[in-house]
């Protein structure tokens, strides 16, 4: 399947820096628009909202991104947008042959449960921690502390003197995530270079963390969080 998400760019006078949406998470808010299946020949045909910056991530069977698209595309109303693949020359054209997807009607995106919304730690990830982790990671029995509603001031920078309010649980969890920074070198990533399984968080859970069995849907939420650069 493909995960389709959109960038919600910052408005004038809105906070705009590497830490605006999370620690080194990027400049902009991201909204998951939905997923769409991929045909056996690798083709896909689907509709997207017009005049919206769109990014695409191919997913594995568990719902984790195999590759990251570090750019975006937009479509005008009624426009047909096509691409030849993540690793192909941008000046090349598709092979002139019929694909499985082209013989079918364009699919509508399967929107996430609860609808399209900004993907935030407090709304998406904290409930996963509440259900699976906080019974032990409660500031008393085990560290780190993953309880909610504990706001702290995060200070960064010698020249900029940035002070921001973050959830303590976010500050405690994000170091366990392996992801690219907001201004990484511009090169084509190797497939699975930043796969969620490379993050210590996922490795701990998959290895069996004190008998905790995180439900599949909650794991998919963690995968999405990692794939969006841990906002």
Show where each model-derived region lies.
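Short, surface-exposed beta-strand/beta-hairpin micro-motifs centered on an aromatic residue
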Residues: 41-47
């Amino acid at each position: 399947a493909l995960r389709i998400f959109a960038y919600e760019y910052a408005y004038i006078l809105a906070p705009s820096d590497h830490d605006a949406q999370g620690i080194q998470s990027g400049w902009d808010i991201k909204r998951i628009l939905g997923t769409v299946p991929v045909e056996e020949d690798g083709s896909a045909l689907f509709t997207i909202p017009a005049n919206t910056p769109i990014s695409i991530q191919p997913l594995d069977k568990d719902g984790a991104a195999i590759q990251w698209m570090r750019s975006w595309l937009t479509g005008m109303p009624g426009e047909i947008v096509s691409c030849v693949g993540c690793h192909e020359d941008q000046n090349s054209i598709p092979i002139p042959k019929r694909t499985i997807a082209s013989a079918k009607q364009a699919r509508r995106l399967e929107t996430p449960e609860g609808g399209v919304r900004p993907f935030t730690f407090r709304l998406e990830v904290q409930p996963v921690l509440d259900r699976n982790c906080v019974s032990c990671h409660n500031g008393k029995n085990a560290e780190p502390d993953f309880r909610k509603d504990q706001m702290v001031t995060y200070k960064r920078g010698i020249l900029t003197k940035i002070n921001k309010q973050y959830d303590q649980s976010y500050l405690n969890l994000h170091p366990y995530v392996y992801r690219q920074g907001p201004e990484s070198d511009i090169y084509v990533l190797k497939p699975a270079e930043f796969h969620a399984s490379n993050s210590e968080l996922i490795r701990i859970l998959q290895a069996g963390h004190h008998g905790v069995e995180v439900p599949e849907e909650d794991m998919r939420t963690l995968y999405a969080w990692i794939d969006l650069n841990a906002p």
